[in-house]
Amino acid sequence: MEDEQIVGCNGFYARHTLKRFLDAQSRLKRSRLALYPLPAHLWLDHIRCVGLETLDVALERRDISVSSFHPQSFQYSLFEGTKTSQGRWTAAYYRRCVDTAAALGCSTLCIEPAGSLLDRSPQEQWRNLVEQVAGLCAYARQHGVQVCVQTVTRAESGLLRTLEELLRLLEEVPDACAVLDTVPASQAGESISLWFSALGEKIRHVRFRDGRTDGGRIWGEGVYPFHSYGAQLLEVPYTGTVSLCGV
């Protein structure tokens, strides 16, 4: 793996200014970012995007680019069908995320479909997920953006928690690609080697995180076997990007 594959990430900079985050990336010599639209850095919802011009100027000044854009679900749910208000606003939000990624010169949109309901039919919610992701892929393709989907943890959702479910989704929505997040993969008992064996070049980004049963951590604050995970990642022929949350 090359050093340039390891990209900076603002995931743990939610309570720091954009300047503080970008200054840190410059010191670490990170020229590419996995960027989350955190309110302190970029405001983004289904109605508007605020701060894009400021962000773009700040990135250009430091010669930093965005390699992947990671919108969080917040109050939106890809498990809602487009016949409901929440479902329509969700679709609008993710389309705006595509627009924002394209405006930043970023061709990879990574989504984490959290928020399935426990007391609603899993079959219905799965159909809604397929509809939403397929529609988003079609829209993103028009803007030169690739949609990538990751699994989520038990605390985040009752669906799409395993590699098996993700494989099913990618079979039903072949235009989508994958993100490997070590936290939900670990909770599901899945290895990095297993993921690459199943998905290969479909994996476009790796969120290489430490964690505990209650979620992700900066490396050293969780319980995951760093050396084992690192060795597995080095063994696979992966040329995509890797984000280390907290860097």
Give the residues covered by each predicted segment.
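N-terminal pre-domain/capping segments
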Residues: 1-106, 175-177
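Histidine-acidic metal/acid-base catalytic patches
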Residues: 1-7, 15-29, 60, 105, ...
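Active-site beta-loop-alpha junctions enriched in small/polar residues
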Residues: 9-14, 36-40, 71-74, 114-116, ...
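Non-cysteine beta-strand/loop elements that form the S-adenosyl-L-methionine
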Residues: 31-36, 67-71, 111, 200-211
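Residues at or immediately flanking beta-strands
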Residues: 32, 65, 144-148, 177, ...
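Alpha-helix initiation/capping motif
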Residues: 45-48, 83, 122, 159, ...
